């Protein structure tokens, strides 16, 4: 009998009934399937229920050897994953009102979820961030932010008038019409021989300086005068009448002023009218020197 007992080896399965063994196998399979099918971000309630489904023998043995460790939760891989906390930043002031209201709603829901999980599991879940907080961090609305500088630049562009050439004080009728410009004779240029009309100066500004050169006086006198182009039938008569008008208006009595007047007529008109101009000037000169009244 003793020899038989010495050769026979007892196993742990011989001491337990077969029904217990089948139950333990089924529990281990269900726990493995539950861990594989569950997502990475398990909620606090699911984590606590999965811990309660462990085998009773392991729990009894752990409480017998480590009585203080029964209060602390067992370590698991899912708990280590959740320890890595993500920093949550406050929303910037550039967000719209609609986005801020939605964020407030999300923060309220996340705070209520955290309160339920704290009451169910314990104080150690304070370090773990809930999935609602992760949704709060990753906001899928990139177009909700608006730059304040862009709004100011758009307002400034709206204030600028469309057409810079038109001033706000002028009416559209006056803005369309170009201003009247007086064309002056800037340089002493002899006109071409095939010109159709004669040119008559209308105004000559006299200078009181006695000492001046003939060239400078001629150029300045012509620059400050205006010329009118006329088509004439009797050019000698027209030249004579215009010379008399110029002498009477400007009160020309000095020889230098009369010479400037003659040079002005010669420079404005072509060479074909020079003989006619000289004849008209001689007639007016004779009348002035003799002191006779100028008859038209």
Swiss-Prot record:
It is found in: Nucleus. Its main location: nucleus. PROSITE patterns: OVATE. The keyword Transcription applies. One of its GO terms (molecular function) is DNA binding. Residues 92-115 have a biased composition (Low complexity). GO terms for biological process: negative regulation of DNA-templated transcription. Residues 136-159 have a biased composition (Basic and acidic residues). Residues 60-69 have a biased composition (Polar residues). Keywords: Nucleus, Repressor, Transcription, Transcription regulation. Residues 27-115, 131-196 are annotated as: Disordered. The keyword Repressor applies. One of its GO terms (cellular component) is nucleus. Residues 228-287 form the OVATE domain. InterPro entries: DNA_bnd_dom_ovate, Ovate, Ovate_C. Pfam families: DNA_binding_2, Ovate. Residues 78-88 have a biased composition (Basic residues). Transcriptional repressor that may regulate multiple aspects of plant growth and development through the regulation of BEL1-LIKE (BLH) and KNOX TALE (KNAT) homeodomain transcription factors. Plants over-expressing OFP3 have no visible phenotype. Interacts with BLH1, BLH3, KNAT5 and KNAT7. This is Transcription repressor OFP3. It comes from Arabidopsis thaliana (Mouse-ear cress). The lineage of its organism: Eukaryota, Viridiplantae, Streptophyta, Embryophyta, Tracheophyta.
